[in-house]
Amino acid sequence: ISPDENLLIYGEDFTGRREYTLRIKDLHKNKLLDDEIVKVSPNAIWSSDSKYIVYAKKDEETLIQNQIYVHEIGTDQSEDKLIYKEDDNEFNIWLSESRTKKYIYIYIEKTDSSEVWLLDKDNPLGNLELVLKRSENHLYSIEDGGDYFYALSNYDDAKNFKVMRLEKDGFQNINNWEEVIEVRDTHYIEDMLTFNEFIVIQSRYDGIPIIEVFNFANNSLNQIDMKDEVYDLGLVYNNNFDSSFFRYSYSSLKTSPQILKYDLYDNTNNVIWKKQVNNFIDTDYEIKRIKTLARDDTNVPVSIVYKKGLDLKNAPMLIYGYGSYGINMDSGFRSTITPLLNRGFIFAIAQIRGGADMGRYWYED
């Protein structure tokens, strides 16, 4: 929806090739505009004045997303302005909007290298500004934090990533970047959200997802406690940069999905939604986390769930694992395993290598 809340943009794909047609609807008049933008990505971003949209387009032969255009509402697609084109087919392009709603980020990425450009939402036809030129084995992303930009970066062999502060002048020299949260061998940083006075970090510690809060006022970094030994979580529905709280999803092998709200100032945690599961009583089940030795003597974490009172030595077990593409196998709620548990099975999830459960090295090794 446009910033003035008058227009809605949406994408249609009728071929299955993920080449979308963007259409624009006037919400007050309840009718479609004549604008039709074909063979593009569906994630368009509005300019601040609601007069332009910025979108990505794929190469017609390779289908690699490699072009960024600006479209003026009410004009033909042939008049759209090309503002960036990537010539290296190893890189893919995608768009993102800053949490402050001031910038559009253009990300150019491949597996081990990235580059970010800034576009001012107040001036979508203006010049792009490079954050930091791409280099081999350097992955970074940025977020606006008001007075500064903040970057997640693996610069200088920080495989588990660190958080760095960037002055809004001179950030094209990485020597000017200031380390805020140092790289830790025990913590793999996956995501961050900037707020007016805080940064919320989603990390992994010993293979388990955690949330940490960095307070600008005293430079403290504190972890939020969770109720279960193993679980799954994720940051959700946090669009307001000036908010005093954030929301996150949570579930475990014995806790049905829920959404919680965490107050950044008084450090309170409240459940605001929970999925009701018929005939499921969480206190009937037990969850544990163990580690087992692989053939090369590496400890592999395994989460298990079973019904209380079960004879574990003689019970059958169903074990699940997937290790590829850095995909994590977290211990979230699975209603499909309840019948097995009630019949005396143990269910286990192994966090095998190939995922990034234990950090970047877990994937690379």
Predicted regions and their residues:
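Structured, non-catalytic alpha/beta "coupling" segments that mediate domain-domain communication
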Residues: Y148-Y155, N160-F161, F241-I272
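C-terminal structured "cap/appendage" subdomains that terminate the fold
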Residues: L193-L260
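Multi-bladed beta-propeller domains
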Residues: T15-R17, I24-P42, K58, H71-N92, ...
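Conserved blade-register residue in beta-propeller folds
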Residues: I24, V70, L118, R165, ...
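A flexible loop/linker signature enriched in serine peptidases of the S9 family
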Residues: E12-T21, E36-V40, A56-Q67, D76, ...
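C-terminal substrate/ligand-recognition segments
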Residues: N154-D156, Y188-D206, T292-P301, L340, ...
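Conserved beta-propeller blade repeats
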Residues: I1-G11, V38-A56, D88-Y107, R134-S153, ...
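Cap/lid segment of the alpha/beta-hydrolase catalytic domain
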Residues: G11-E19, H28-L33, K227, Y262-T268, ...
